[in-house]
Amino acid sequence: MEVLYSLSKTLKDARDKIVEGTLYSNVSDLIQQFNQMIVTMNGNDFQTGGIGNLPVRNWTFDFGLLGTTLLNLDANYVENARTIIEYFIDFIDNVCMDEMARESQRNGVAPQSEALRKLAGIKFKRINFDNSSEYIENWNLQNRRQRTGFVFHKPNIFPYSASFTLNRSQPMHDNLMGTMWLNAGSEIQVAGFDYSCAINAPANIQQFEHIVQLRRALTTATITLLPDAERFSFPRVINSADGATTWFFNPVILRPNNVEVEFLLNGQIINTYQARFGTIIARNFDAIRLLFQLMRPPNMTPAVNALFPQAQPFQHHATVGLTLRIESAVCESVLADANETLLANVTAVRQEYAIPVGPVFPPGMNWTELITNYSPSREDNLQRVFTVASIRSMLIK
């Protein structure tokens, strides 16, 4: 994997800097590095593809070295270099696609394609020029079963979940109380509602709770907490739990009271915040508990009082909500990130070449299914293919 990264970094630099008119002295170190790459690769044969519709391709390396010059690089020099660069880039692209198409239930973090396994040989170690990539560093740590630390912005840590729980119900569905939520990606939105606006609740206050269990622990998370859940702020028709009927939800938004958010690790509270909105920090957690209240307004204007009558029918439904959004966090496991294209790149390659469903990844790389059942085998394979995708992205956009 380190060799693949070093090859890609060298080729990217060569493509960007070996251009007509450039002083040789400005790129002499790069050209020496480029020549070292050619010397190491010459005389070797590789094969890629042969899975799904990814075609089998054979690669032979037998290139001359780039020479020295006292002057600027001329058109012939650059054209010769470009021919070599384009062949190498095509090779790297196919090695990456071959690797992204493969998976293994055992030691899935290790190279799976024939070409990348060959590049892991001792003879290619001299190509290791630059291993500064975060993904390469963490791939090395994971390969040795040591602690990794990926920094994610907008991490897709929450599997998609959209549902409701009714704490008070009846066949007519005309006086309901409960919670509804939407968890997805890096965001939780939860709403508590009471058709009667807590008229019969103790002290006219309804208590709500929403707990979300993470599939992997996060650390040093920057989080935004807002006293609103905009996705539940408009009328809608909702299917009943048994699917036998539908019920009408017509929210009128109130501000939540006594809001508390707890971040837990292995059942122990690590951080807790009360009545604090905006940016908050969570040190280390694998579960989130949101607690909040709906309080019937003690004083109401006639217009508000008309919204919340003392008895049925209840045409408007008192609702309070919260939004919790993870802006950035560190995770020991690799995750999809809304700010990165790695999952999209891997999925696109596997779809384009009709890669058959293997023993590890779900059909279509369905992220909700993948993260819901995030096994060590999936974690290993995902770290490998994401690392390869990050390498490929240096050369192929």
Curated annotation (Swiss-Prot):
<keyword id="KW-0862">Zinc</keyword>
<keyword id="KW-0106">Calcium</keyword>
<comment type="subunit">
    <text>Homotrimer. Interacts with the inner capsid protein VP2. Interacts with the outer capsid glycoprotein VP7. Interacts with the outer capsid protein VP5*.</text>
</comment>
<dbReference type="GO" id="GO:0046872">
    <property type="term" value="F:metal ion binding"/>
</dbReference>
<keyword id="KW-0946">Virion</keyword>
<dbReference type="InterPro" id="IPR008980">
    <property type="entry name" value="Capsid_hemagglutn"/>
</dbReference>
<keyword id="KW-0167">Capsid protein</keyword>
<dbReference type="GO" id="GO:0019031">
    <property type="term" value="C:viral envelope"/>
</dbReference>
<dbReference type="Pfam" id="PF00980">
    <property type="entry name" value="Rota_Capsid_VP6"/>
</dbReference>
<dbReference type="GO" id="GO:0019064">
    <property type="term" value="P:fusion of virus membrane with host plasma membrane"/>
</dbReference>
<dbReference type="GO" id="GO:0005198">
    <property type="term" value="F:structural molecule activity"/>
</dbReference>
<feature type="binding site">
    <location>
        <position position="153"/>
    </location>
    <ligand>
        <name>Zn(2+)</name>
    </ligand>
</feature>
<keyword id="KW-1154">Intermediate capsid protein</keyword>
<feature type="binding site">
    <location>
        <position position="286"/>
    </location>
    <ligand>
        <name>Ca(2+)</name>
    </ligand>
</feature>
<comment type="similarity">
    <text>Belongs to the rotavirus VP6 family.</text>
</comment>
<keyword id="KW-0832">Ubl conjugation</keyword>
<dbReference type="InterPro" id="IPR001385">
    <property type="entry name" value="Rotavirus_A/C_VP6"/>
</dbReference>
<keyword id="KW-0479">Metal-binding</keyword>
<dbReference type="InterPro" id="IPR008935">
    <property type="entry name" value="Virus_capsid_a-hlx_vir"/>
</dbReference>
<feature type="region of interest" description="Interaction with the inner capsid protein VP2">
    <location>
        <begin position="62"/>
        <end position="73"/>
    </location>
</feature>
<comment type="function">
    <text>Intermediate capsid protein that self assembles to form an icosahedral capsid with a T=13 symmetry, which consists of 230 trimers of VP6, with channels at each of its five-fold vertices. This capsid constitutes the middle concentric layer of the viral mature particle. The innermost VP2 capsid and the intermediate VP6 capsid remain intact following cell entry to protect the dsRNA from degradation and to prevent unfavorable antiviral responses in the host cell during all the replication cycle of the virus.</text>
</comment>
<protein>
    <recommendedName>
        <fullName>Intermediate capsid protein VP6</fullName>
    </recommendedName>
</protein>
<dbReference type="GO" id="GO:0039626">
    <property type="term" value="C:viral intermediate capsid"/>
</dbReference>
<feature type="binding site">
    <location>
        <position position="266"/>
    </location>
    <ligand>
        <name>Ca(2+)</name>
    </ligand>
</feature>
<dbReference type="GO" id="GO:0046789">
    <property type="term" value="F:host cell surface receptor binding"/>
</dbReference>
